[in-house]
């Protein structure tokens, strides 16, 4: 099993010393060739769980009262910082919900992509640049050579999101964590990006998609989990069966709302 989350609690300590429980007793598994859709409304805890997989939550204020996050048999929560840096990017790629907060404002887009590639792959600068431009094209960015010379603030939100997606996918990691990956994208580019992610999991990688969009889940997921108020309330190994007959009242409400929006 590539990813095995066991009895995970994620909590945050406020400035006043209060403890807020973001996720409680979460158990999830994800193997190579699978796509897990983790769905729920804002504040349900899904992003806290997903970011814990690569231990990306700031600590403090985040902490883990109990549980394990096993990635390829090793507990991420017990890894040293050098061990974490070795797997982030190369073995675990992350598409963040807020791209502008994840890209350096001081460096050009192309330079950031090249740096990421050369940090994890033993290739020349020229080869890394060619690879970066190729991936900018793959995620639907026109004139990749021109855009590569831009700074993040010179790109639209949708363009920034596509850069983040290229950065996460280009090293073909074992696991991709995508937090609302298509929110800022138009329908055409969204389809293009989802196709790239499908190709990746078919190449024996795993994908964890965090979203409130059940349409994305229906297109992508091979299994899904529904979160509400920090807890997993329903899981399904057959998404089609889930959409046909969700069991938990909250899941039923989500599916009803998705159908209503389709009709609108």
Question: What are these language model-derived features?
Answer:
Residues 191-203:
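Helical segment within the ABC ATPase nucleotide-binding domain
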Residues 170-174:
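A short, proline-enriched helix->beta-strand linker immediately N-terminal to the Walker B motif
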Residues 217-219:
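A short, surface-exposed alpha-helical micro-motif characterized by mixed small hydrophobic
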């Amino acid at each position: 099993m590539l990813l095995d989350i066991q009895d995970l609690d994620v909590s945050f300590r406020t400035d006043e010393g209060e403890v807020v429980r973001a996720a409680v007793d979460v158990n999830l598994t994800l193997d190579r060739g699978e796509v897990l859709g983790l769905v729920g409304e804002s504040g349900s805890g899904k992003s806290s769980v997903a970011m814990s997989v690569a231990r990306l939550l700031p600590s403090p204020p985040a902490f883990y009262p109990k549980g394990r996050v096993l990635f390829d048999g090793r507990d991420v929560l017990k890894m040293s910082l050098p061990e974490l840096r070795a797997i982030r990017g190369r073995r675990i790629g992350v598409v963040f919900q807020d791209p502008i907060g994840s890209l350096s404002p001081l460096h050009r887009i192309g330079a950031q992509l090249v740096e990421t590639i050369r940090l994890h792959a033993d290739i020349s600068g020229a080869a890394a640049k060619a690879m970066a431009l190729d991936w900018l094209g793959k995620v639907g960015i026109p004139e990749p050579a021109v855009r590569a010379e831009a700074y993040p603030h010179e790109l639209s939100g949708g363009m920034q999101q596509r850069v983040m997606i290229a950065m996460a996918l280009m090293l073909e990691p074992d696991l991709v964590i995508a937090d609302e990956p298509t929110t800022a994208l138009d329908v055409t580019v969204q389809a293009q990006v989802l196709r790239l992610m499908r190709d990746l999991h078919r190449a024996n990688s795993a994908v964890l998609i965090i979203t409130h969009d059940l349409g994305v889940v229906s297109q992508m997921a091979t299994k899904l989990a529904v979160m509400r108020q920090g807890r997993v309330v329903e899981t399904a190994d057959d998404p089609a069966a889930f959409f046909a007959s969700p069991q938990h009242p909250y899941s039923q409400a989500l599916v009803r709302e998705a159908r209503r929006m389709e009709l609108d």
